[in-house]
């Protein structure tokens, strides 16, 4: 799977399904579930490393975990899901040259075929444009952008008319810059629908309703492994309680033997 294949999916009205992964096991499970895209998201800072936000994640962390995820893929290369890696905080907000260097390290050091960049501010636009010119495919991300939570919080975006117009403008800009797809996070469903209708590249929604060209979820949220669930992700099982109870049963039985 290549970034350009996602555009074909949109052209054919074929839904794109994506999950996050953070190690070999989660990567293998995602591949076996037949997802189209696996995102090594900076959410692994919280899911896997125990941080309270995505901000402490380093370039070295994301490279390490991307390689672990890719080792979980067992299908033929052409049949594997598209592997996309988040650029961590301050690896692309530090100027074009450094951003190219850091994104280049991700692509060179892992099997990722694209990077994801949050935001569409003028400085970020320059970075995205430069990365794409250098041959590095970029997935955009607008709406709720977790790396900006110190300024914007983690609240739903696009609630005001002004905010909606900005998000629509940002989406158009990202398409013109050459992004192959855009993540739309935690925004009104009708806003996401309008953006989806106006773009020729696919939109991947998370907390943005059902009209996007695809859906992505943090796997740990979907499996109910976290104590704090985002309001837009309903777990399909209560995994943490299930695993805890089963492990406790085993511990108790072993103590009796």
Curated annotation (Swiss-Prot):
Top EC group: transferase
A cellular component annotation (GO) from this entry: cytoplasm
GO BP annotations listed: pantothenate biosynthetic process
Keywords: Cytoplasm, Magnesium, Metal-binding, Pantothenate biosynthesis, Transferase
Main location: cytoplasm
Reactions performed catalytically: 3-methyl-2-oxobutanoate + (6R)-5,10-methylene-5,6,7,8-tetrahydrofolate + H2O = 2-dehydropantoate + (6S)-5,6,7,8-tetrahydrofolate
Active site: 185
Binding site for Mg(2+): 42, 86, 118
CDD domains in the cross-refs: KPHMT-like
Superkingdom to which the source organism belongs: Bacteria
Species lineage: Bacteria, Bacillati, Cyanobacteriota, Cyanophyceae, Synechococcales
PANTHER family: 3-METHYL-2-OXOBUTANOATE HYDROXYMETHYLTRANSFERASE
Species of origin: Prochlorococcus marinus (strain MIT 9312)
Name the record gives this protein: 3-methyl-2-oxobutanoate hydroxymethyltransferase
Residues spanning the signal sequence: none
UniProt similarity note: Belongs to the PanB family.
Role description: Catalyzes the reversible reaction in which hydroxymethyl group from 5,10-methylenetetrahydrofolate is transferred onto alpha-ketoisovalerate to form ketopantoate.
GO molecular function: 3-methyl-2-oxobutanoate hydroxymethyltransferase activity; magnesium ion binding
Protein localization: Cytoplasm
